[in-house]
């Protein structure tokens, strides 16, 4: 956790990590503000959240993410670009790692775990960055070699195997439900019009 005040000596804020959020404007990246921050501040990492989370915005398409990654690279070649890909796995033909993201993170309890994995997450991307994340998430010297625990490998493997079909069926159901709700004048979930 970043931490609000830095009072905890274990928060990221206590380690000197600062955070600044640039909100979307009408579901589009605020390119002007992003470029301005990248030019004015010592930015080490840009994080992009693909899913809508609990907000009412649309999830970001891979094309929108690719476009902003190119814009970020025009301004700063060295910044690390991380995409939180929760709920974004397997919904389009490309993934964030295919379009220039340095590191991609997500949950195994959602799309990639096929709804079967009871816990867990994943980190994928450039080898040196995955190594750094593994060292921080577990323990220095153990890193990625710790692996899954609690006898959950069976659920993880089943989840990853079932994920493509589970995601496909979830998308079909969401599109169908959205269309049906719109026919009764409930227009808040217009997924059937989303690419």
Regions found by a protein language model. Give the residues of each.
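Hydrophobic alpha-helical bundle architecture
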Residues: 184-186
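Conserved PLP-enzyme active-site core in the AAT-like
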Residues: 1-168, 172, 178-181
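Single conserved hydrophobic/aromatic residue that forms the stacking wall/gate
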Residues: 188-195
């Amino acid at each position: 956790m970043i931490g609000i005040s830095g009072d905890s000596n274990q928060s990221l804020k206590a380690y000197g990590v600062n955070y600044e959020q640039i909100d979307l404007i009408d579901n589009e990246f605020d390119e002007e503000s992003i470029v301005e921050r990248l030019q004015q501040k010592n930015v080490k990492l840009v994080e992009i959240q693909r899913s809508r989370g609990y907000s009412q915005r649309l999830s970001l398409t891979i094309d929108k993410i690719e476009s902003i990654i190119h814009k970020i690279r025009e301004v700063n070649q060295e910044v690390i670009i991380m995409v939180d890909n929760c709920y974004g796995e397997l919904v389009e033909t490309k993934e964030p790692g295919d379009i220039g993201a340095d590191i991609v993170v997500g949950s195994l309890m959602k799309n990639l775990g096929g709804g079967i994995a009871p816990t867990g997450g994943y980190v994928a991307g450039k080898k040196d960055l995955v190594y750094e994340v593994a060292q921080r998430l577990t323990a220095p010297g153990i890193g990625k070699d710790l692996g899954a625990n609690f006898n959950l490998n069976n659920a993880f493997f089943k989840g990853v195997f079932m994920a493509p079909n589970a995601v496909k069926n979830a998308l079909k159901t969401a599109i169908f439900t959205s269309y049906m709700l719109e026919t009764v004048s409930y227009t808040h979930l217009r997924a059937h019009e989303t690419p």
